[in-house]
Swiss-Prot record:
Keyword Membrane (UniProt): yes
Protein name: Cytochrome c oxidase assembly protein COX20, mitochondrial
Gene Ontology terms: cellular component: mitochondrial inner membrane; mitochondrion
Function, as annotated: Involved in the assembly of the cytochrome oxidase complex. Required for the maturation and subsequent assembly of the mitochondrially encoded COX2, the precursor of subunit 2 of cytochrome oxidase.
Location, primary (coarse class): mitochondrion
Domain of life: Eukaryota
Subunit (UniProt): Interacts with COX2.
Membrane topology: Multi-pass membrane protein
Side Mitochondrial matrix, residues: 110-115
Disordered: annotated span: 1-27, 165-205
Organism annotation: Saccharomyces cerevisiae (strain ATCC 204508 / S288c) (Baker's yeast)
Transmembrane segments: 91-109, 116-132
């Protein structure tokens, strides 16, 4: 370091700055050669990367599950809330129908209330699952058809957005063709009237 006579720094401050410069120089890559490209993976990380991506994902998943569990209330299980679920009605109708039907058949055939109850509950669960899946597939298919229709309409060319060129001679041509048709119709009517007047109304046998 060049000595400057009018410098305000003391010798102690200069000695303290020299180790700092050495420490800063130690952070620089020592195996660097002139013209060499330094990649990002060769440099030390700027931020602490203690948690991996999988650990962060698990942590976020736990937080999401905790928020979902805390958001559950007893009022969510009311009849009004349950009937507002899209496929709850179809699943309930098919499940209860299967329960009554299978329970009645098993009770009539085996005369055992326990066996009939077991079969009825099993039929309720299976029927509800089948009804729910049928309703879900129908809704999914209808959503796909609606999305396809939206995409088809969006891809269509909108003619009203562009100026359509009009030929000024077209109205005159239409009028001329209309007058010509009118004159031909009148001429044919006159010919028919003349032919009918010239034809005799009596006939010799």
């Amino acid at each position: 370091m060049r000595w400057w006579p009018w410098s305000n720094q003391t010798e102690d401050q200069k000695q303290q700055q020299q180790p700092q410069g050495k420490a800063d120089g130690d952070r620089v890559l020592t195996n660097y050669s002139r013209g060499q490209k330094i990649l990002l993976e060769d440099t030390p990380p700027k931020f602490a990367d203690d948690l991996s991506n999988s650990q962060l994902a698990k942590k976020q998943e736990r937080a999401t599950l905790k928020e979902a569990w805390d958001s559950i209330r007893w009022s969510d299980f009311s009849l009004q809330k349950l009937t507002s679920i899209p496929c709850f009605r179809d699943a309930g109708m098919l499940g209860f129908s299967s329960m009554f039907l299978m329970g009645s058949i098993i009770f009539i055939y085996h005369k055992s209330p326990t066996k009939a109850t077991n079969w009825a509950m099993s039929s309720l669960i299976l029927g509800s699952i089948v009804g729910w899946e049928q309703c879900r597939l129908k809704r999914q298919k209808s959503f796909q058809i609606a999305q396809l229709a939206k995409e088809t309409v969006a891809k269509k060319e909108k003619p009203m957005l562009h100026n359509v060129p009009h030929d000024p001679s077209l109205p005159g041509q239409w009028e001329a063709a209309k007058n010509e048709k009118q004159s031909q119709f009148e001429q044919s009517n006159q010919n028919l009237s003349q032919a009918s007047s010239e034809k005799k109304w009596y006939k010799f046998w």
